């Protein structure tokens, strides 16, 4: 029997990357999936986002695991449209047990207009809140909410550093992830009497389309005009404690599975870092 057998999971940003990986693993462990993605680009985010055919492929992979998939094209910035999409998915499957607020962008390009800050915050912070708050009415005791943060949330200088190297979008990304960490803490306290768990996962560099994009390469290698993947990967390990360039989406999915499963039934309000020791490089020990 799978670790989330008989459960229904809602995942935003599910068309590719970490979201697709989460959908596939949760399906392999017995969950039906409500997969949501915007499936179109956002102007200030200079790498291409997923397309409808990517979302279809996620559904195919879920069904290949023997589970049901309900797909919705929706923008997490639009709470009303998102709520309607979630309602349709829950109407089809009859319940909702797991919420994974995964959708995110990282418009790290120097010289972008201030709108890039707004877009990053709208997706990475308000989008998380919109998904979760549109889902709460469907949840019950034992349900699990998981928000995707970032190791940037723990960097004291993340906003300044990202703002310098990645423009206003990089600053917005770092700011949003910091507030997500605080939000998860406070929401976990709020929902504890209902026995609904709320946790955050904070990845480091992850091997997805977001990382492997010209704007991100440039953010890591501002000394080069048009850095290649190979040139960027030389400095990727500086973020981690381990001498590796990035973790894999599946590494994050295993953490999602744990937090979604009954193995974590008393785990709430946690900031789970899947960062290959990145936090240890930037934060001195200050006691438990």
Regions found by a protein language model. Name each.
Residues 123-143, 152-154, 188-189, 193, ...:
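Amphipathic alpha-helical dimer-interface segment in Rossmann-like NAD(P)H-dependent oxidoreductases
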Residues 97, 105, 113-132, 146, ...:
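Catalytic Tyr-X3-Lys loop
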Residues 2-40:
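Canonical Rossmann dinucleotide-binding motif of NAD(H)/NADP(H)-dependent dehydrogenases/reductases
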Residues 105-109, 146-193, 204-207:
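Catalytic loop of short-chain dehydrogenase/reductase
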Residues 192, 197, 267-269:
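Short, small/polar-rich loop/turn modules that mediate ligand/substrate recognition or access, typified
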């Amino acid at each position: 029997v799978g670790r989330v057998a008989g459960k229904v999971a809602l995942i935003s940003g599910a068309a590719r990357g970490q979201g697709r990986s989460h959908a596939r693993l949760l399906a392999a462990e017995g969950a039906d999936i409500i997969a949501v993605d915007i499936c179109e680009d956002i102007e200030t985010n200079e790498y291409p986002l997923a397309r409808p055919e990517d979302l279809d492929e996620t559904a195919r992979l879920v069904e290949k695991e023997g589970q049901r998939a309900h797909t919705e094209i929706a923008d997490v910035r639009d709470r009303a449209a998102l709520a309607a999409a979630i309602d349709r998915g829950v109407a089809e499957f009859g319940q909702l047990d797991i919420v994974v607020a995964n959708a995110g962008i990282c418009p790290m390009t120097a010289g972008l207009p201030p709108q890039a800050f707004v877009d990053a915050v709208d997706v990475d912070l308000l989008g998380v809140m919109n998904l979760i708050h549109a889902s709460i009415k469907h949840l019950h005791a034992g349900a699990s909410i998981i928000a995707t943060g970032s190791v940037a949330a723990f960097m004291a200088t993340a906003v300044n550093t990202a703002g310098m190297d990645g423009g206003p979008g990089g600053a917005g990304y770092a700011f949003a992830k910091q507030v997500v960490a605080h939000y998860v803490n406070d929401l976990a306290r709020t929902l504890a009497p209902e026995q609904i768990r709320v946790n955050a996962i904070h990845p480091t560099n992850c091997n997805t389309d977001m990382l492997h994009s010209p704007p991100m390469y440039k953010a890591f290698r501002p000394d080069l005009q048009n850095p290649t993947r190979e040139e960027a990967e030389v400095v990727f390990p500086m973020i981690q404690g381990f001498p590796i360039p990035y973790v894999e989406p599946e590494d994050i999915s295993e953490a999602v599975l744990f937090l979604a499963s009954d193995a974590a039934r008393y785990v709430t309000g946690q900031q789970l870092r899947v960062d290959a020791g990145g936090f240890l490089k930037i934060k001195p020990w200050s006691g438990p």
